[in-house]
């Protein structure tokens, strides 16, 4: 029994937070969670994949029982503080980058509107150049608290393939994340039988057969290997993770970047109120204006929320179950008149019970909290610089507050 958006208590409704993947864009989800806490919205279930899975694990297993939101923000600030700043190099190269990529034309300034457009264009240029620089920094040096390049000399003694890079299947080791997360996660909270914490669901994909892998704290002990698995994105050049003998996992975002279906499968009886964080917005207002924005928009579509069909089917199934309920009540009220044998009666009742246990949940409400994109750029999800992380956290909190306030006024 938990508070709704107006502060009233509702029985038999699960509050669910669904967190998408998206690299450094996961800081937006941190801000969203901060807003939910401030509005006293208790969560029953948290599901995530990739960086969303990392966020979810920190929230559900937080070592700070009273303020998991503060601990999650601390995690993101720690990542940003370990971002390798290459400003001295880029101070030298930036003018050339700007000239080559953005300033090889004369922008006319014949009226106030054009001046305003020019100022806005220059601002966008500066942000995009900064994101490009941040990407190069992460690619070259990694992030000590998250991932390290495999070519660093410290791996020479421990990596048997260090001197044969033609055999490499990954470029970055994200096992440093384990030590970092130990400061934030109490794994004893992420196991069956611990009902005082939100249920945690992480998703991954089996490298060999492409089937979904679901890690559910109500069914198994969640360990650091499961968090590494859900964030093992091969196109970021992270390695697969062996989660069981012979079972090798990659990032769940390869199958679905929005693990809503897994939530419905895991908890099929209790109705849901869903808060869905969209790091990659489904809808935008304008077409791309250059090839970089074309690639950016294509990526947004690939990783955007595609659960509309799941939501529609959930509602269709609810209508069917309501109809079955009506028919079943007619059956029970007239069972004696039907003169059915005991085996047939028992079979009908078993089927009725199974249908309700397997598919009884309904999505009562769903709140989409979508990140706005003022200056779209293909490298935005690799920018772990302090200013960007702080801005993402703030924008997530602001957007969540806006969505919650809008629903309260309805």
PLM region descriptions:
Residues 1-49, 58-410:
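Patatin-like phospholipase
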């Amino acid at each position: 029994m938990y508070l709704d958006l107006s502060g009233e208590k509702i029985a038999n409704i699960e509050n669910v937070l669904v967190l998408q993947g998206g690299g450094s864009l996961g800081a937006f989800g941190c801000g969203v969670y901060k807003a939910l806490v401030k509005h006293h919205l208790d969560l029953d279930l948290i599901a995530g994949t990739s960086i969303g899975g990392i966020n979810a694990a920190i929230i559900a297993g937080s070592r700070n029982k009273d303020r998991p939101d503060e601990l999650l923000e601390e995690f993101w600030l720690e990542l940003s503080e370990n971002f390798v700043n290459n400003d001295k190099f880029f101070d030298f190269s930036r003018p050339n980058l700007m000239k080559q990529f953005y300033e090889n034309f004369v922008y006319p300034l014949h009226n106030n509107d054009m001046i305003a457009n020019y100022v806005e264009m220059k601002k966008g240029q500066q942000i995009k150049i900064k994101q490009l620089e941040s990407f190069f920094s992460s690619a070259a040096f990694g992030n000590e608290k998250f991932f390290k390049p495999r070519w660093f000399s410290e791996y020479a003694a421990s990596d048997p393939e260090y001197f044969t890079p033609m055999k490499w299947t990954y470029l970055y080791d994200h096992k440093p994340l384990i030590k970092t997360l130990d400061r934030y996660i109490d794994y004893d909270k992420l196991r069956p039988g611990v009902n005082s914490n939100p249920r945690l669901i992480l998703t991954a994909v089996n490298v060999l057969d492409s089937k979904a892998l679901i890690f559910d704290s109500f069914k198994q002990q969640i360990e650091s290997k499961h968090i590494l698995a859900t964030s093992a994105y091969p196109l970021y050049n992270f390695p697969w993770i062996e989660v069981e003998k012979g079972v090798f996992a990659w990032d769940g975002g390869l199958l679905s970047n929005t693990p809503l279906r897994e939530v419905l499968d895991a908890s099929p009886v209790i109705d849901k109120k869903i808060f869905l964080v969209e790091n990659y917005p489904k809808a935008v207002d304008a077409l791309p204006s250059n090839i970089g924005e074309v690639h950016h928009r294509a990526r947004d579509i690939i990783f955007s929320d595609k659960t509309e069909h799941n939501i529609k089917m959930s509602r269709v199934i609810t209508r069917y179950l309501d109809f079955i309920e009506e028919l079943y009540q007619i059956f029970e009220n007239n069972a004696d008149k039907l003169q059915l044998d005991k085996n047939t009666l028992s079979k009908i009742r078993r089927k009725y019970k199974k249908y309700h246990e397997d598919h009884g949940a309904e999505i009562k409400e769903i709140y989409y909290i979508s990140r706005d994109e003022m200056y779209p750029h293909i490298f935005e999800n690799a920018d772990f610089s302090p200013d960007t992380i702080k801005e993402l956290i703030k924008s997530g909190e602001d957007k969540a507050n806006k969505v919650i306030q809008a629903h309260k006024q309805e």
